[in-house]
Amino acid sequence: MFDLLIRNAQVAQADGRTPPADVLCHAGRIERIAPSIDAEARETVEAGGHLLLPGVIDPQVHFREPGATHKEDLASGSRAAVRGGVTSFLEMPNCRPPTTNQEQLDWKLAQAAQTAVANYGFFIGATKDNLDALNSVQPACGIKIFMGASTGDLLVDQQSDLERIFANGERLIAVHAEDEARINERTAALLNDLTQPPPYEIHSQIRDTQTALIATGRALELSKKYGRRLHILHLSTGEEVDYLRNDKPAQVTCEVIPNHLFLNTHDYAQLGSRVQMNPPIREPGNAERLWAGLHEGTIDIIATDHAPHTLEEKDQPYPKSPAGMPGVETSLPLMLTALQKGQCTLAQVLAWMCSGPAEVYGIANKGQLMEGYDADLTLVDMTATRPVRNEEIFSRAGWSPFAGRQLTGWPLYTIVGGRVVFDNGAVRPGVLGKALSFDFTT
């Protein structure tokens, strides 16, 4: 007997075709895809002609465990993920204590094995003192460098330290590209003489376009100098797209997040600190240039940078208000809504959110709906239109910057390793994800 049979689905192919088919899953893999399958299975999902996608891989989340589990933890964050059709996530190291050695990585892996309902992988955080660990810990999806200070205590901004990290080892380096010196200069210029808390939109002026562009340029030059595999996280400006369009070696990839595609500085007026993040949301016009970067291939993939804080924390006056917002459970509906508005194609969504992240991080057998691949899937209702509601958010933060926005295309079922984990609004008990492995040799 097989584990799972999905009947009468529109099965999404990498080229955007959606032929009707049944999908048979067993032992965590897609066993067979055919127009009609007659087989006994422990569970049958009647897809009703809805669209079946490969599970989304979110390559940048902050699930806050250990150290800030009042905001999120691996259990709540992964529940939010599967609600949004995300079946695998890569989690960042800026927790407390930070993930900077094998002991901390092992702790996270053990915790995720007991609580995460999606598949999981973890970055190791770079400091100026842990060069040996950066290249020896296993398994890690990459090295995270904060070139500009953000949530947590990880910061590497001195050129000599960056040179040592890029020059030693072969593991992928993922950079938060904001220039710390310029942040400090802009902070002094714009905040030091104020007697009243400034408006939240000053955040986008402090961490301005040049703050991002300087750091992106530094990282790119280091990658070229040492031939090092580089991934630039959350591009936010049109200037970065222009820069990379003209000078992006084969070993360099980059991403954008929905916040920078669907929000801009006008949103501060209504949402205030809820849209404060690093790098910040930008002036109108940048989103169009980021979209162009996606379409032309300068930008490779989409992540969320899911970075939750409580509303009590977010409502503090600037600059005490922390940067970051939830996003893991709305990214796919946002992109499916964009698809239906003609901003992208299904093939592009699949490349940006499924197969692309698997390729960037060397994750085998994920990201495509093919026989022999892992049975990580999401069944979506492309006709379902409803607003994002804070009271329905699974993240422990309990809110979304997109609350009230009408989105079309919501997951009905999410399947991890051939087992249904999210079922029409609820997470089933007893299903856990598995640790991801990473191969950068191919």
Please describe what each predicted stretch is.
Residues 12-22, 359-391, 405, 424:
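Acidic, glycine-enriched loop/beta-strand segments at the rims
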Residues 132-146, 151-302:
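Histidine/acidic residue-rich metal-binding segments in metalloenzymes
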Residues 275, 318-319, 387-403:
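Short, surface-exposed loop/helix-turn segments at secondary-structure junctions
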Residues 36-52:
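Active-site metal-binding motif and surrounding structural segment of the metallo-beta-lactamase
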Residues 1-40:
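N-terminal metal-binding scaffold of metallo-dependent hydrolase/deaminase domains
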Residues 50-115:
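Metal-associated gating/positioning segment near the N- to mid-region
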Residues 197, 201-218, 222-227, 274, ...:
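His/Asp/Glu-enriched, well-ordered alpha-helical/loop segment
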Residues 110-126:
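A glycine-rich helix N-cap at a beta->alpha junction
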